[in-house]
Curated annotation (Swiss-Prot):
The gene is ycf54. This is Uncharacterized protein ycf54. Keywords: Chloroplast, Plastid. Belongs to the ycf54 family. InterPro entries: Ycf54, Ycf54-like_sf. It comes from the Eukaryota. The keyword Plastid applies. Signal peptide: none annotated. One of its GO terms (cellular component) is chloroplast. Its main location: plastid. Disulfide bonds: none annotated. It is found in: Plastid, Chloroplast.
Amino acid sequence: MTTYYFALASQNFLLVQEPLEEVFRERVNYYQSNNKAIDFWLIPNPSFLEKPEMISFKNLVPKDAVAIISTNPIFINWLKLRIGYICIGQFEDNLQLSEESLNITVLTDKI
C-alpha cells in the first residue's frame, strides 16, 4: 500500500481564485531540472472522498471538490502554507499513480 497525501478545496477556489497553474508550472520545472518523476496529480471530484473514513473531509468541501494528490507530504504541507484555505489529509491505497499509468506527457518545449 502507498500513502497518498492530499490538499482539498472547491474547484472554484483552486482553479479560478488561486494561481495554481503557476504553482504547478514552477513545480514541474523544478522536477525536470532535477530529473525527478512527477509525484503529484490534480484530480477533480476525487473518488477517495466516497470512502467511509473520508466523510469528515467530504463534508468540508462542496460537491465540486478538487484534490491535489502526492506521495510527497512536504509538497502538500507547502501547498497548505502557500494557499492557505485548503484541507489536507492522507489515505492509503493500492493505486500506482505515475506518468506512465496515467498516460501523461510532459511537454518540454516553451510555447
